[in-house]
Regions:
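Acidic, low-complexity cytosolic segments
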Residues: 1-23, 30-121
């Protein structure tokens, strides 16, 4: 693992320690895993591919509806909350319990993104 990927993984682990986020990963817009703090029972390749696909669809929907640049995509399931937040050429995907406080999670995710941007340069 590269030094940058290791630093990003540390940021993701910190996000999970300091918030209700239970899993997180940084994925390229092309669907490649850049850094992961996903649990071992989660298929990283599938998550990376689906994250890229969801981000692409979200951007197309935003464009079609003329709603501006996509900020984040939130999927609310019965058991989990999934938040995708795009950086310039990557997407941070985070999972949390369905009853988690979305405002606080959003705040913590944005703080992690600021740190990741510093690592990526």
């Amino acid at each position: 693992m590269s030094a940058k990927a290791e630093k990003i993984r540390d940021i993701l682990s910190e996000l999970e320690r300091n918030s209700e986020v239970t899993n997180s990963a940084l994925v390229s817009l092309k669907g490649q895993m850049m850094a992961s703090a996903l649990h071992k029972d989660i298929d990283e390749r599938a998550v990376a591919a689906m994250t890229a696909a969801l981000t692409s669809v979200g951007a197309r929907v935003s464009d079609t509806l003329k709603s501006g640049k996509t900020g984040s995509i939130v999927i609310s399931g019965t058991d989990k909350l999934i938040v995708l937040q795009q950086l310039s050429q990557a997407v941070l995907i985070s999972l949390a319990p369905a009853d988690a406080k979305i405002g606080l999670i959003d705040f913590e995710i944005n703080a992690a993104i600021d740190k990741i941007k510093m690592v990526l340069g």
